Amino acid sequence: MNRKDLGKISVIVSTYNRCDALQVCLLSLFKQTVLPDEVIIGDDGSTEETASLIARLQEQAPFPIIHVWHEDKGFRLAMMRNKCVARSTGNYIIEIDGDVFLHPKLIADHLRE
């Protein structure tokens, strides 16, 4: 698959009050051999600590990071992922959980035929 044929690549990262894991996850996205065009963090009602971490990492990121948050009313992961897909501008979407450390070629491997 050719990157140009795909258009924009969006990575959606779901999270809930796991700043330690989210930071590791996002830093591993920074080191991808093929960078996404945007990363959308779907936050299922985390505290302000998560928003602060995301704000700090937005300043360092080699791509836009968009923080999508909704109030904590129980586990609503599917609803949050749907909001993130609606917010994305990518033609190709990769969904991951916020506690995943990514291999540097994860996106490149997705693009292989």
PLM feature segments, named:
Residues 93:
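Short aromatic/hydrophobic "clamp" motif used to bind/position activated sugar donors
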Residues 17, 29, 44-45, 98:
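Conserved short acidic donor-positioning loop in nucleotide-sugar-dependent glycosyltransferases
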Residues 43-52:
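A conserved acidic beta->alpha catalytic loop
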Residues 49, 100-112:
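Acidic donor-binding/catalytic loop of UDP-sugar-dependent glycosyltransferases
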